[in-house]
A protein has these predicted regions:
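N-terminal beta1-alpha1 ligand-phosphate binding loop
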Residues: 2-29
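A generic "alpha-helical surface" signal
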Residues: 13, 62, 102, 144, ...
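A generic structural motif
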Residues: 29-35
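Helix-loop-strand module that forms the ligand-binding subsite of alpha/beta enzymes
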Residues: 39-127
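Glycine-rich phosphate/pyrophosphate-binding loop and the adjoining helix
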Residues: 120-190
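Residues at the starts of beta-strands that form the adenosine-phosphate
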Residues: 3, 33, 86
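Short hydrophobic segments within beta-strands
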Residues: 7-9, 37, 90
Length: 190
């Protein structure tokens, strides 16, 4: 059974709300165990435990929060021992254009330095709304497309863990039995 950790830092509760939605998305794929943990309660054992990880951070000055960065800096003695995990990112920002995509890229860079395989999501969760670099929000996720982008990120992580860790090829995203585009986008294409 694949194991997914949704690890987040949340200052005002917005990133935590996103993390809960990401965890809901993970639960859409059967046979995947999920843990939801704030960075303040996590430790190195949680990182060793998981096969896949969704990292979430608020955007502070266009990048990762110092709390999230400090956690990974303190994990440096474990570098090269965590290689091969699957990772993705999500971030909240104060307003659109606040740098959440840059934060997701910074989170993925941290994971890449630890040898993780990282990905984005090409699905369209709403009109002109994707999670190529990870799920991003301005404030808390309120609109359906924002909620769905978090869930899709979690589901995609669970799919990749099922495929690469559990060997369940039928869980490949391209074989999914769900629409990879929103209703609005699908009807526009027809």
């Amino acid at each position: 059974m694949g194991k997914v950790l949704v690890l987040y830092h949340s200052q005002d509760g917005n990133t935590e709300k996103m993390a809960r939605l990401v965890a809901e998305g993970v639960c859409e794929i059967p046979g995947i165990e999920v843990r939801l943990k704030s960075i303040q309660k996590a430790n190195r054992d949680d990182i060793y435990w998981c096969d896949g990880i969704a990292l979430g951070s608020p955007t502070h000055f266009g990048t990762v929060s110092s709390t999230m960065k400090k956690f990974w800096e303190e994990l440096l003695p474990d570098w090269q021992k965590l290689d091969g995990k699957i990772g993705c990112a999500f971030s909240s920002q104060g307003s659109w254009g606040g740098g959440a995509e840059l934060t997701c890229q910074a989170l993925m860079t941290i994971m890449m330095n630890y040898g993780f395989l990282v990905f984005g999501v090409t699905d369209i969760s709403g009109h002109q709304f994707t999670a190529h670099y990870g799920a991003t929000q301005a404030g808390e996720p309120r609109e359906e497309k924002q909620i769905e982008s978090c869930r899709r990120l979690g589901r995609r992580l669970a799919e990749w863990v099922a495929v690469f860790i559990d060997g369940r090829k039928e869980s490949h995203p391209l074989l999914g039995k769900y629409s990879r585009h929103s209703e609005k986008e699908t009807s526009k294409e027809e």
